[in-house]
Amino acid sequence: MKNLITTILLGCAVSVQAQTSTAHDIFSDTRIITSQSVETNWKGEGTFIISHRFGDIYQNDAYSILYNFLGFDGGANMRIGLDYGITDRLMIGGGRSGYNKTYDAFAKWNIMRQQSGDKNLPVAITLYSDISFISDTTNAVLDSFFVDRFSYAYQLMIARKFNEKLSVQIMPTLIHRNLVATKAESNDVFALGAAVKYNLTPVLAISAEYFYNLPGQLPAGFNDYSALGIDIKTKGHVFQIQLTNSPFLIPEYYIGATQGNIIDQDASGQFDLNLRLGFNITRDFQLGGRQY
């Protein structure tokens, strides 16, 4: 009788566990292209990240594409960063970008995971916030008040994995700059971002992201950020190759300071192409916590 009761209880436990399924790997990494994804590091997991954006591929004419070797000879921007999982749902990170010699720090908290079955949660939700600091000393305007060097970003990420191939995320975002260059710019910028990932194979995916800035917040010449990427996933590494209209690597800049649509016109009305090659390389490592 004892054995029978034990068997029944174990069977019920397995049955209940099997009735709830959590969606994993909604996106390939904690970044989609430049923007953050709902994914967070596991507890004790660290990630070293190098992000690089080259110069404009197209400069004045088609000849410049090869002359500047697809933008490799142009001005580039790079960010080196380090992330760490405090818990399985909370991660922190920081880095430095070459543009304005900017330092940034962020926190990201996954408050809900997508689940199906006995406990049905149709989406995953993650909160994100960061702070950035301009350390460049060549801009005399920033010398007036120390706090003028700070900017902030706040983001709500809502994502759904529809099947093993398709994932979608939306990102309502607010950025705040303590100092802006002109009166035509708003200190606060509201934007709505959207991203999609489609798995071609278990290790290869294509992704795209776009941020729409609400009208009346930025002066003429500033545009919405967009990007298209390819993700190559291996054990412990994710290599991402991108095409984007922005050289920037943190939301305060790629949302609030991107200039030029991908297909555009220059000041003289001639055809212009604002497109840059870029890449992200990530390396995961274990410092403690979860054992694999």
Which residues make up each language-model segment?
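Bacterial Sec-dependent N-terminal signal peptides
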Residues: 1-23
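Compositionally biased, low-complexity repeat tracts
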Residues: 7-9, 40, 189, 225
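Transmembrane beta-barrel domains of Gram-negative outer membranes and organellar outer membranes
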Residues: 19-140, 150-154, 160-170, 174-178, ...
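Flexible, glycine/proline-enriched loop segments at strand-loop-helix junctions
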Residues: 141-146, 180-183
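A mid-sequence, solvent-exposed acidic-amphipathic segment
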Residues: 165-166, 170-212
